[in-house]
């Protein structure tokens, strides 16, 4: 579909719609002589060395200029909204926030939640890995950038503003506030599509640089049964109109600052506080600014992913500045590395401050990718500076604007330091891995490590392709690293597998039923109730109301009894489909629509679930206070006997920390704090409590249920809870586990379950005390004494074993038989498998075969180097006679026979084969 985007301003002020002679795309301009759209590669940068904005701005100044303009606009005042975290806890379909509109997806755009202001303005830190291989090279690409934006949400019956006003606001900001030349601004038409939405759009271009994108989101992906008359085709995909029309704009903060300064690269304009110290530390040779300027001008014409090879860019720049490609590479490479390090460490600062913990999965994987890529760049520069020192520079510079960085500084730096140590260990182990792979390749006659294997080395072992190449080339094996390698692995990490939960029954079967009244929320202590049967679907019964809690939010379903016509029927499962609750029963044939039934839940099971669920929230509050604000819930489950809570954390939890967590949690229990729950509109809840609400994951709906433990923990949670913490009873941490990189599991018990655990421990102590015949308080020192005595005794046993092995060898040497020219020893002996191996190795000579079998059936075969036999052949011969299995190398094999009675026969078989 072609959109002709004629606006009020274009008509009234004499703008001309033209077609770019290079790319063929339509654009609007005030310049009648203009023939190109202003977008690279149609136009080069014209502002480098000649700033396109009269005044020089810093990041803070430009951000404030933008936000103030929209906030204080006379006709369209916008509400100023604080930045959202780069880790989007409110949604589960993306790993990181990559644009300001993502802050408001899906809830605001779908109409399920109100925007925090309408219209609104925001400057949103955004992280994208799609251009990671361009960072440092092109002069303009970042992994972290701020997208300044103004958004308007036009709901049915509530129009805010649309295309005309958006274009006018953008033009007013650029020309009146920033004093850009109107005749140099172009609006290029380029429909936008992404994330399931689409619409017409303008790219705003100035002096060869895209400074803003104005998207008019008004379509959504067409369903299979869409009305053909409503369908439009955008970029090859089918879309239908949305009810809500959204103004989605994005202005590049860093690009506008760069435009105002005219520096050789955007990095020089916004990251000088890191770049300059790194240049000094690395002793980087000062180069002619013209080289950097020409590099940026030409790099602006294409992306590395598009051109395929960085060498092409080098050749073009070298030609322009009149030096060789090799000399250009030598001069410019250190700058590119420093630029990339400065960008990557800034992205890390935001990610770690907002709760990302480096790991092998999801956003943690992307953080680790940045860490290891930065370390690799430092290594290439020959710099020994710790990465944490560079991150500290960002924290110092950015904390006045983002005070949360200072608050999290110690934890951020410790995470980075630990990751550096892990990476050093990875490199130490990695060399052997690569060499083993090279040996396999050489056996197959190959002499190049394929791309898939490079990706595996990186993803599974953390080995960067540059390190693999370094090792491989020493072994005479080639490695080709694609210019877009890191973009490829980042794309793989960002792919989200959409797991569809299997529905208990087809939603179509319950969609016409009324919502089930949730008595378990109205009164969590309700044990019995009456209800009417609305429908029976196979062995599931739907009631008009229920006190049975359905499975969800980490809390298991209730069980119990439904009494129908005097018959007690067991309820074995309770699930929710949409807003309808279904009860699985043992005898569904007894239930008829319209019948009144009496429900009775298993109260002991439910109350223990309530203790554990409320205890989970108390424990979470203690974990955050002891370990730090980077801690987020990564999963939970509970039962009657125990509960588990998975959290993001970058190292093992120490014993001292466990004691403090347990102490704090039990203090909150003893203080008997009030536990309140309330239903709030999503936007109000977000504004009131922030995004820590979503500890338990994404919660759907316009209205969400908030659980609030007085001055301790607030979460969006759909479970059943106790009205005060005192009812939880004692909380006992049973153990912690490292379930995956970056995730700790805490297993704990509350109430009676905790008491049972203490009783078990007391019984163990009592029994141990009786066995050792010492009072409980003397158990540690007694156990230590016994352990030391056992160690000494073990040393003596080992000494004796070695003496016996010597005697065995001496005895067996006297039993050598001659079979032709071959010496043969074959005996059934006393001793362990270790004894057999040691004896066989000592007895092995170049012209000798040794077969030793012990009373348990373990055997060892040793064959001399000069003999034309293999130990493995003899192992197979032995097991063919006496059963069992075994195998080994040419000179030594081992195994175990099944029939010990046939051991002598097997030995004779080997002897007879010589």
UniProtKB/Swiss-Prot annotation:
Its EC number is 6.1.1.7. InterPro entries: aa-tRNA-synth_II/BPL/LPL (IPR045864), Ala-tRNA-lgiase_IIc (IPR002318), Ala-tRNA-ligase_IIc_anticod-bd (IPR018162), Ala-tRNA-synth_IIc_core (IPR018165), Ala-tRNA-synth_IIc_N (IPR018164), Ala-tRNA_lgiase_arc (IPR022429), Ala-tRNA_ligase (IPR050058), DHHA1_dom (IPR003156). Zn(2+) binds at residues 613, 617, 717, 721. Keywords: Aminoacyl-tRNA synthetase, ATP-binding, Cytoplasm, Ligase, Metal-binding, Nucleotide-binding, Protein biosynthesis, RNA-binding, tRNA-binding, Zinc. GO terms for biological process: alanyl-tRNA aminoacylation. GO terms for cellular component: cytoplasm. It catalyses: tRNA(Ala) + L-alanine + ATP = L-alanyl-tRNA(Ala) + AMP + diphosphate. Its cofactor is Zn(2+). Its main location: cytoplasm. It is found in: Cytoplasm. GO terms for molecular function: alanine-tRNA ligase activity; aminoacyl-tRNA deacylase activity; ATP binding; tRNA binding; zinc ion binding. The keyword Ribonucleoprotein does not apply. Binds 1 zinc ion per subunit. It is an enzyme of class 6 (ligase). Pfam families: DHHA1 (PF02272), tRNA-synt_2c (PF01411), tRNA_SAD (PF07973). Consists of three domains; the N-terminal catalytic domain, the editing domain and the C-terminal C-Ala domain. The editing domain removes incorrectly charged amino acids, while the C-Ala domain, along with tRNA(Ala), serves as a bridge to cooperatively bring together the editing and aminoacylation centers thus stimulating deacylation of misacylated tRNAs. Catalyzes the attachment of alanine to tRNA(Ala) in a two-step reaction: alanine is first activated by ATP to form Ala-AMP and then transferred to the acceptor end of tRNA(Ala). Also edits incorrectly charged Ser-tRNA(Ala) and Gly-tRNA(Ala) via its editing domain. Belongs to the class-II aminoacyl-tRNA synthetase family. HAMAP family: Ala_tRNA_synth_A. This is Alanine--tRNA ligase.
